[in-house]
Design a protein with these regions (language model features):
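Active-site entrance/lid segments in N-terminal catalytic domains of soluble metabolic enzymes
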Residues: 1-78
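Conserved active-site-proximal phosphate/metal-binding subdomains
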Residues: 61-83, 89-169
Length: 169
């Protein structure tokens, strides 16, 4: 009804939504952080996958496989189209993604810093000022890893994770 042509799913198996979406003419791209998950998405009928390397902001999965390894493997094993995701920022990212077999690329964090994004200017400036050394991985002990821009709260969380060790559940 609203004209949505493509939906990206992530985090859980999208099988229960596929019939309704595809019957409505919507293409389903499932975000995957491993080739094994990408193959599962292909097997259940997803139209494409977004292969998300360890470089990504947000949830990089638990396998820690960067795009220079992940994308060629996906190209070798998948029969459905895939786009590269994770750490993508500009034309160089696109050229590299295409060279590794992707049909295109997906940028997430990069768009937070655009003038169109409804995000506070301080957040945009923090992203623009950040270097490759300014992110941290949190929630690893819970196997729900997230890559986040570091700040004092993140550093406190990491200290708490370290202090709690095996007691963190």
């Amino acid at each position: 009804e609203t004209g949505v042509k493509v939906v990206e799913t992530a985090g859980n198996n999208p099988a229960k939504w596929l019939p309704q979406l595809q019957d409505a003419g919507v293409k389903v791209i499932h975000k995957c952080t491993s080739v094994r998950h990408s193959l599962k998405a292909q097997d259940i009928g997803c139209d494409a996958v977004s292969v998300d390397g360890f470089e990504c902001g947000g949830h990089p999965g638990e396998d820690d496989i960067p795009n220079f390894i992940l994308l060629p493997r996906a190209a070798d094993e998948l029969e459905i189209p895939f786009v590269a995701s994770g750490g993508m920022a500009d034309a160089r990212s696109l050229v590299a993604s295409l060279a590794m077999g992707a049909e295109g690329m997906n940028m997430g964090t990069r768009f937070i810093a655009t003038k169109e994004a409804p995000v506070h200017e301080n957040v945009k400036q923090a992203i623009l000022a950040a270097s490759e050394l300014d992110t941290r991985l949190v929630m690893r002990p819970l196997r729900n890893t997230e890559r986040v821009l570091t700040n004092e709260a993140v550093e406190r969380l990491l200290e708490k994770e370290k202090a709690m060790g095996a007691d963190l559940k």
